[in-house]
Every structure is written in structure tokens, then in C-alpha cells.
Amino acid sequence: MWQAKKSLIEDACKAAENYYPDEFLCFFGGNKEKEIITEIVMLPSYNSEESASISEAVLPIDDTIIGCFHSHPNGNNKPSQEDKKFFKKYFINAIASSPFNAENTAFYSQKGEKITIKLV
């Protein structure tokens, strides 16, 4: 089962709150074999009320990026079809909805299936 520090997820949610009403996008660093998220990775992205996107050219070339986190300011933390396409690139994916906190953050697999993670 994937795990992460609750404070790390809360930090990502705080950043999402700061971008509101625009969507916010960041990435998770960690260890895919141990299924642990260890850091938030901030990279230059384009943010708007409708979407958040990033140029693949700015992503690290190694395997330290294991997941993504983004916000849905509309209060819905379910993935869109575009989200599901994006999820295929990462082992773990998160969507936070307003109000932004760990409790309103849903986690998804590469297949777009909702999963439970352990917050420690």
C-alpha cells in the first residue's frame, strides 16, 4: 500500500489553495518499489481555471518522479478523461478538491482506479 506523510499532502494542498481559482499541478518524488512518496517536486507549469499542464521537456530524465498531484477547484476530486490519460505516466496520482486538505484528496492508480494510501 502506498504511503506518504500527511504533512506532505497538506503542503501540496496549501499550494493548491494559493493557486485557487486556477488548477495547480506538482509532482511526487519517492520510491516506487517501497511505494512511498517522499517529496513534492515543483516544476514550471501552466495553470488556469480549466486546466494545468506542463511541458515534458522540464521533467527529470531519471525515475525519481513517481506521481502527480493536481487540484480541481470545482470541488470534484474525480478524474476527467484527460486526467486518466495523464495518470498512465505515473505510479500514483492525486486530485485535491476545494476545500483543499488531505481529506479532500483522492488517490488513483495508473489505470485511473481509486486507491487508498496510508497517511502517516
Annotate the PLM regions.
Residues 1-65, 74-120:
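Conserved beta-strand-loop surface patch within small alpha/beta domains used
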